[in-house]
């Protein structure tokens, strides 16, 4: 079942495009890109979420990430 969001697809796609442009500008390989994005998520959780909620948010994020991964072997 798709998740409802308070953000429009346009808002999400615009921000995603800008972030991808930064990674491409720096010619960041996949492993570096994942490291940077992971550090960004960690920083957002640690600085924007109440300590009592951090673990639950991290678990929810991890589950959402895992459920969005495509098992198609093609890149």
Swiss-Prot record:
It holds the Pfam family DUF1414. SUPFAM superfamilies: YejL-like. Disulfide bonds: none annotated. It comes from the Bacteria. Belongs to the UPF0352 family. This is UPF0352 protein YejL. It comes from Escherichia fergusonii (strain ATCC 35469 / DSM 13698 / CCUG 18766 / IAM 14443 / JCM 21226 / LMG 7866 / NBRC 102419 / NCTC 12128 / CDC 0568-73). The lineage of its organism: Bacteria, Pseudomonadati, Pseudomonadota, Gammaproteobacteria, Enterobacterales.
